[in-house]
UniProtKB/Swiss-Prot annotation:
Catalytic reactions on record: 5-oxo-L-proline + ATP + 2 H2O = L-glutamate + ADP + phosphate + H(+)
Species of origin: Carboxydothermus hydrogenoformans (strain ATCC BAA-161 / DSM 6008 / Z-2901)
CDD domains in the cross-refs: LamB_YcsF_like
Entry keyword ATP-binding: yes
Family: Belongs to the LamB/PxpA family.
Origin superkingdom: Bacteria
Official protein name in the record: 5-oxoprolinase subunit A
Matching InterPro entries: Glyco_hydro/deAcase_b/a-brl, LamB/YcsF/PxpA-like
Amino acid sequence: MKYIDLNADIGESYGNFKVGEDEAILPLVSSINVACGFHAGDFMVMAECCKLAREYGVNLGAHPGYPDLWGFGRRSIPYTKEEITNMLLYQLGALSAFARAEGVKITHVKPHGALYNDAVVKVEVAEAVARAVWVFDAEIAIVTLPYGRLFEIASEMGLTVIREGFADRGYLPDGRLVPRNQEGAKKTGDEAVAQAIALAEGWVKAVDGTVIKAEVDTICVHGDNIEAVKLAQKINRELLNKNIYVQAWRKKRA
């Protein structure tokens, strides 16, 4: 029997600004990554997401980013290693308080946007992210691409690393994601569903047609995608057709 974790980035609304359909996607995924107030999210949204994690029994992850509401955390900002570590600790502490109030725990950390991409290629950023998780709680896992600096450094430190693939993003031949400002960056509809199935089976096709080996533990559907709920529904259905079951990576598997 084969299993795959399906995760969604949620909690990215704040104030009167609404992003995504958080509760609607919860029955369709096994893990969530909650924005922690720096790139998106606020204290009311974070509290609600922790409540939903408890109600739906999904893995609760922190989704910290650069302090960049204006750019939605998708702009790389030069910070020192100490600053990056501390900004992550700040965000982890905030989400942890809401999680504790709901009787749940943070199971993983997935950096957001530019911080995620920087940690893949920049040693200093990867070290800062890994250190933040290590000093906060070394039992918490890190979610990242199945290669790159963060994967290597976190693994060397003995942290649990969850290898991630993306249903709705294009891939470069080297396994990195196509930058959002380039052609082929996004996958939609049936193309995204097909890519999710391929990832669950251990491979993905790059924008140039190259077939890449991709052993992943979890597949992401971006919650801010307007078709996220429909996409997650279709992915669930097609995975079942392949006898692949959606289940949180933390749970014991037969």
